Amino acid sequence: MEKMMGVMLDCSRNAVMRVESVKKYAEIIKKMGYNTLMLYTEDTYEVNNQPLFGHLRGRYSKKELKEIDAYCNEIGIELVPCIQTLAHISSIFKWENVYDEVNDCDYILLVGEEKTYKLIEDMFSTISEVFTTRKIHIGMDEAYRVGQGKYEQLHGIRDRFDIINEHLHKVCEITEKYGMKPMIWNDMFVKFALDIKDQYADSDNSKIAEKASLPAGVSLVYWDYYSTDYERYAKMIETTKLFKREVYFAGGAWTWNGFAPDNDYSIKATKAAIEACNDCGVDGMFFTVWGDDGAECSKFAVLPALMYAAEKAKGNDDLNNIKAKFKTITGCKFDDFLLFDKLDTPGGKHRRSASKYIFYNDLFLGVRDCLCSENDGVYYANLEKELHNVCEKGSFELLFDTYEKFASLLKI
């Protein structure tokens, strides 16, 4: 069976992609060599018996998801749902009269509560109805304070690994009922099993063997987009394998710093990650396109990073060859897309979220003046010209035009 090679699109941060845009993305990544598209939807999909789940959030209807699924099947892409069944669903708790009883604390569901599992079953009944695949990502990442809110009041202080493992078993019983094969993010299980805050720190990994009682059918996804260190990736792959379950890797195509992408760093991190994945062995991989803080960056802006990842996974590290393939697929030059990165490199040096803090810097108060250079205006004027002079924009004329106008604004 062909291993998963996928892209995950974040459709939860106030920017649910239009059906036609998802189809276009699926077409592009299929040409690049990907076989899977994942839709990350925290509360942005219709759920049976839950009218307020995703209400006023631009959620996908069942009809829309069926349309996307049918199209992906037609072109040879497996559409996989990526949801949350423990944390990261803060928006539903705004409907206090409806969901307060299933809220532990923060954005975390209340483990052990019957109504929690009724909600989760409604999620699965919907998903099994609209998706062809039987694969599903059920989340469970970054539930840092699980068991420390309402759960603690009801049950007292307990080992948090035991809490999330019990929850995972209950959720997996539901996935089994619907014939689905679940995968989860690895971070909380590694941290709680080892009783550490930093999963990348040296630790006694033998503790995992004592707690490695995860459901038989679940897979673990090691996610990491923050390093260019091969050894770190290799270490964490081997650590995650100690749970004795299938292991997938999730890298990142950086779209979550603000308005500008970071293809350059994405490529460097991806190179190290894929080399570690190939050497250590994983059961599949995918690359996340997150939209933290309002999805200000276009998901199409990181197509160069995704092109590189697809080719690197095949063993191709010839950048000139990769650029030629990118041109064939998109009708645009690889290096022209990299101009978008330059919004965050005034003066030729990367400054994280530079375009964002310059844009929001109050002209009268100048709170961020200390982070700006007197030459930034000239830099952005030149970038505006570079973007304007791009001749081959393919079907991405609007994208180039948007960034050109943004550079024009930043030069002021």
Residues covered by each model-derived region:
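Substrate-binding groove of N-acetylhexosamine-processing glycoside hydrolases
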Residues: 18, 24-27, 67-70, 76, ...
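Feature activates predominantly on carbohydrate-active enzymes
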Residues: 1-177, 183, 248-251, 256, ...
